[in-house]
Amino acid sequence: MSGALLVAGTSSDAGKSVVVAGLCRLLARRGVRVAPFKAQNMSNNSAVTVEGGEIGRAQAIQARAAGLEPSVRFNPILLKPGSDRTSQLVIKGQVAESVTATSYVQHRDRLAALVLNELTCLRDEFDAVICEGAGSPAEINLRATDLANMGLARAADLAVILVGDIDRGGLLAHLFGTVAVLDPQDQALIAGFVVNKFRGDPALLQPGLRRLHDITGRPTYGVLPYADRLWLDAEDSLSVLAHRVVGAPDPPLGDDWLRVAAVRLPRISNSTDVEALACEPGVLVRWVSEPSDVADADLVVIPGSKATVADLSWLRERGLAAAITAHAAAGRPVLGICGGFQMLCRRIDDRVESGAGEVAGLGLLDADIAFHPAKTLRRWQRPLAGYEIHHGRVSRCAEHSWFDSDAEPQGLVRGAVFGTHWHGLLDNDDFRRAWLVRVADAAGRRFVPGDTDVAARRDAQLDLAADLLAAHLDVDAVLGLLDGPPPRPRLATRLCR
């Protein structure tokens, strides 16, 4: 077995990342040397690699599915939106510059050569490379500069599987329409379809799939059921916006639920940090955006942000800053992670990310933050595992450290207010359980932690994704596409008959 294929989608959050992760785990279990690849990702959920670079978190979890350490090779271009018009451009793990949609186009030829070279090297090294597209190939206004969808498929002669989310409605039109708007050369690369998140009896869908085959000349390789217990790290903000409650919480082992309000910031980054909390029995994590949502919370979490100063201003405008301050004044726990930690401090000097200069923070921690042009990218392994991705650094501090790692003080704490630049800290099981007991005591809750192993649960979820594909996908037909796109008719020809 050798080759590569591309998993594209009818939209963002259609299920591309899950299908790629499932295929990587399925192949790895068969002893196939497989690697994930996403030429260009736009996401503020990122991870630090073995090289000390930064990639999309989805590619990090896909690497785990394949039994590999995350590497910048798996996601050579990462765009991190900082506003509606600008993004931070990360090339092979390192920050290059801030770009607009217009200025980014100027880099297209150089970046296209880079991603094609990376994919070629991976194909030489691995038996199979499972590529993931970005957004939807139906965005034909972007086709001339596309690096991740049909642009990559055409350059590398990849067969393309098109995944659609039927839970949103209108899927058959989405699948047909996506193929229909492509030019004939791109149409020829679309090998077939995968239906994702189907509820009910698949037999009811068959007449529609037969009609889809008749008008496109393309098969549907599988119908994946809606799996509400499937828990994989979310890639983009659509996943956060779609679910008010994180995960499917198990009932408490003690007398009380522990209620967590995670603030849904406009430029949220690494929203996955709160998912470890949602793994614990008796912990209910909700995404919130109104002051009233904070009132009954035992713990408030301000997650990371790609635009710390702008999101801090948003907190104030919505009245959330006052609600969080009142929550802390009552002695109830607050946690800030990365950008959220910076917001908790007394003063922020940002002449890098926003150019706002000196800005007052919430003042819940007696410390100052200064932004630096050089981004801190660091992985920690022992005794606690975590990673850092930030421009802001503590420039003055009058608080106690929260915890130590490698004999270095990390994070800050004042009473029941906690802050850290670390992502992934709550994935440490013993640390998380002990801290939740401390949080529950401060909140007056009778909470008993469970024995959840987050790493084992994450691997079990990857196995579940692979099992779903094995049971509901024509895996042999899909793997046959690794050799290249099979002949498929032009849609216009089919429709004129």
UniProtKB/Swiss-Prot annotation:
Keyword Membrane: no
Limits of the GATase cobBQ-type domain: 257-431
Active site, per annotation: C338, H423
Pathway(s) where this gene product acts: Cofactor biosynthesis; adenosylcobalamin biosynthesis
Coiled-coil spans in chain: none
Keyword annotations of the record: Cobalamin biosynthesis, Glutamine amidotransferase
Gene Ontology BP, a term: cobalamin biosynthetic process
InterPro entries noted in UniProt: Class_I_gatase-like, CobQ/CobB/MinD/ParA_Nub-bd_dom, CobQ_GATase1, CobQ_synth, GATase_3, P-loop_NTPase
UniProt cross-references to Gene3D superfamilies, sorted A to Z: 3.40.50.880, P-loop containing nucleotide triphosphate hydrolases (3.40.50.300)
Keyword hit for Transmembrane: no
A GO term, aspect molecular function: ABC-type vitamin B12 transporter activity
NCBIfam families: cobQ, PRK00784.1
Functional note: Catalyzes amidations at positions B, D, E, and G on adenosylcobyrinic A,C-diamide. NH(2) groups are provided by glutamine, and one molecule of ATP is hydrogenolyzed for each amidation.
Similarity comment: family membership: Belongs to the CobB/CobQ family. CobQ subfamily.
Protein name: Cobyric acid synthase
Species of the source: Mycolicibacterium paratuberculosis (strain ATCC BAA-968 / K-10) (Mycobacterium paratuberculosis)
